[in-house]
Design a protein with these regions (language model features):
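Sec-dependent bacterial lipoprotein signal peptides
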Residues: 1-25
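The feature marks long extracellular or luminal low-complexity segments
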Residues: 23-184
């Protein structure tokens, strides 16, 4: 064997091993939930009737609780939230009167995106600038208590019956509820 041929044979395994070491040292990313974990929506919404059809009103904060097979809270796992009428192309509300729909009937809000104060403590008009409005479906991580949270913003101009909210894990565990929004 010639010298370049031997160098090539020795270099290839070293390259493969170093690539594996680098890839494995990145840690458990993405944070998938182990098999047997479950998700439960703690506070599902009931039907909502809005008093002022021209307002934007935040609904309750929705919490999804993730547990391992033994029933203990599990942190830093992905929870996928999905809300009907809140997808990227679900524009059904005309906000400026020009006859063109330019807003969603329901809007998902990530409460962790408002900084330095939580979204609950700042006016709704600032949520967009903070980047808190997100498209459905949206993935969020659980905190150290096993809870992932979302806020649903409701436009009072449109009736929605029924809307479906779903929280799911990558292992197939799903919890959902239906509710309706009706203007008076």
């Amino acid at each position: 064997m010639e010298k370049p041929e031997i160098l090539g044979i020795a270099l290839f395994p070293a390259l493969v091993i170093s690539t594996l070491i680098i890839a494995l040292s990145c840690g458990p990313n993405p944070p998938f939930c182990p098999q047997g974990c479950t998700v439960e929506i703690v506070n599902p919404l009931d039907d909502i009737t809005l008093g002022n059809p021209n307002s934007l009103e935040p609904s309750n904060r929705i919490q999804a609780f993730v547990t391992d097979p033994e029933g203990f809270a599990i942190n830093d796992v992905r929870v996928r939230f999905s809300l009907s009428f809140a997808q990227q192309n679900s524009l059904v509300v005309d906000t400026n009167g020009d006859g063109v729909s330019d807003a969603r009937a329901l809007q998902l809000v990530d409460p962790d995106r408002c900084k330095p104060q939580p979204c609950d403590l700042i006016p709704i008009s600032q949520w967009f600038q903070q980047g808190a409005f997100v498209d459905s479906p949206y993935t969020n991580l659980t905190d150290d208590r096993g809870v992932a949270e979302m806020i649903i913003l409701i436009s009072g101009k449109v009736s929605v019956d029924p809307a479906t909210f779903e929280a799911s894990l990558d292992n197939g565990s799903v919890d959902s509820f239906q509710f309706s929004v009706n203007s008076q």
